[in-house]
């Protein structure tokens, strides 16, 4: 019995040893087993051990090679015959896919052949690997510009890669993770880097997110917003940098880069889209801006308007701006009246009266790395003497209160002069170029002007008010006649619409509410709110808006700016022959609705100090 058991154990051990020697044989690079003859001969030379000495632990069976062979056979049988693009490299290897005769292949593309660069170590998770978890695979090196099409791409490599990526997507090595952005062409990647989303708010609180280029200027962004909002581009739209916590705001210059300005703004700050008619008013009327006592050059010589403008833009002969300002002391709530001098090098204050000697001047703020802002509510937030405050703020995101230089002028005209002087001394000729760009665009080209047709050249203005028609030679009279004809056409069309419609509104009722569709009518706002809107959109002559009267429910108020001062005129209703009219001069001139009143005073001065030129507008983005 014991002999039978020993004989069966010996036969089992011999079979296990033969199987382990076969499975654990090392693989060569070509996938063949190493020769075991040396091991067999050495084992024959040694004396055989007893059955108990031959008893060994069971060795793990490496199934990687077997799985590779099965997978290779399965894929070869399941896939159609794919032409091998490199028969000279893989044709002699065992287990290679079936090759196709060269005559059956399509003509090769005109590209240089690929080169084989040998083995490389690649991380493939989730596989039975040896040692450090790396597996030796073959890699092909293609020349620059070579692309793998569906015809030349090896099908087995594509399927294997897809199987690995679907099997273990979470444990994939970071070195093998492919970023989809990295596969994009260089031009598309540059476009992604050069674009940024910017959020812009309007006066009514609405906002719009606009994708812009990183080098887009404030002028270009304003033109883009005008196009998207369907507004009239009259070169008066601006982008406003608004800081609600600090109570500061300023209009960006047309040449400033929007992304660069946004990088210096804190998170709570924002951009506003607003009109500013006074942005380049200085270049139109420079003498009206600076009184003689404020400009040092005016005290030394008697120059005209052109000479004053030239001296402001000239870097060598730039005048000094001087005068008294209220300056907030650093670290205190008190304000102190100081004699201040603004030069191209910076803003200085005198420690001894009005002396401008170098030993008496102290630097208050630098112009290069700073910007000047309007104080929105300086009297409430900073205890300023009045509401004509300014602030010089460094151009950085995190600004402490001790770095702000708070100033306050006596009135609005003095504040406008200081703000304009700061911009002129900082930007100089660049500011004048921004002013000239829209004017150059508006001029017709010298040689490419479109030719008018014969029928257009033969048209003339005619007056048919009398019994005999006459030709209007005066251009001003022709324009006035065209406006009158437009008003008459509007009245006729309104009357026809009322007669043809089933609306129960009486014509007088329609005339009483038709003005609410106009941009210059702002509804029920207070006097302070109307003044604030006028100041925000520029204190220029002729800037106006209409609103409901707070004292008389049936009346309206015309708010008008003249000589940088805001005035209010009441529009009262009056009745004549049972019909309601509106008048601004106690019934001397009557209008059936407010639209006719505004149209009339845009052409005629009348009892107003100036004509109506610009209206305040709020646009919803």
UniProtKB/Swiss-Prot annotation:
Residues 1-23, 33-59 have a biased composition (Polar residues). The modification Phosphoserine is found at residues 50, 96, 455, 458, 503. Phosphorylated on serine residues upon EGF, FGF and PDGF stimulation. It is found in: Cytoplasm. Residues 1-118 are annotated as: Disordered. One of its GO terms (biological process) is signal transduction. One of its GO terms (molecular function) is insulin receptor binding. It holds the Pfam family BPS. Disruption phenotype: Disruption of the maternal allele results in overgrowth of both the embryo and placenta such that mutant mice are at birth about 30% larger than normal. This effect occurs during embryogenesis and results in addition in disproportionate overgrowth of the liver with relative sparing of the brain. The major part of the growth phenotype seems to be IGF2-independent. Residues 520-601 form the SH2 domain. GO terms for cellular component: cytosol; protein-containing complex. Keywords: Cytoplasm, Phosphoprotein, SH2 domain. Phosphorylation by mTORC1 stabilizes and activates GRB10 constituting a feedback pathway by which mTORC1 inhibits INSR-dependent signaling. PROSITE patterns: PH_DOMAIN, RA, SH2. The keyword Phosphoprotein applies. CDD domains: PH_APBB1IP, RA_GRB10, SH2_Grb10. Its main location: cytoplasm. Residues 194-278 form the Ras-associating domain. Residues 318-427 form the PH domain. Widely expressed. The PH domain binds relatively non-specifically to several phosphoinositides, including PI(5)P, PI(4,5)P2, PI(3,4)P2 and PI(3,4,5)P3, with modest affinities. Adapter protein which modulates coupling of a number of cell surface receptor kinases with specific signaling pathways. Binds to, and suppress signals from, activated receptors tyrosine kinases, including the insulin (INSR) and insulin-like growth factor (IGF1R) receptors. The inhibitory effect can be achieved by 2 mechanisms: interference with the signaling pathway and increased receptor degradation. Delays and reduces AKT1 phosphorylation in response to insulin stimulation. Belongs to the GRB7/10/14 family. Interacts with ligand-activated tyrosine kinase receptors, including FGFR1, INSR, IGF1R, MET and PDGFRB in a phosphotyrosine-dependent manner through the SH2 domain. Poorly binds to the EGFR. Directly interacts with MAP3K14/NIK and is recruited to the EGFR-ERBB2 complex. Interacts with GIGYF1/PERQ1 and GIGYF2/TNRC15. When unphosphorylated, interacts with AKT1 and when phosphorylated with YWHAE/14-3-3 epsilon. Interacts with NEDD4. Interacts with LRP6, thus interfering with the binding of AXIN1 to LRP6. Binds to activated NRAS. The GRB10 locus is imprinted. The maternal allele is expressed in most tissues, except the brain where it is expressed from the paternal allele. Expression from the maternal allele in fetal and adult brain was however described in PubMed:10861285. This is Growth factor receptor-bound protein 10. It comes from Mus musculus. The lineage of its organism: Eukaryota, Metazoa, Chordata, Craniata, Vertebrata. The gene is Grb10.
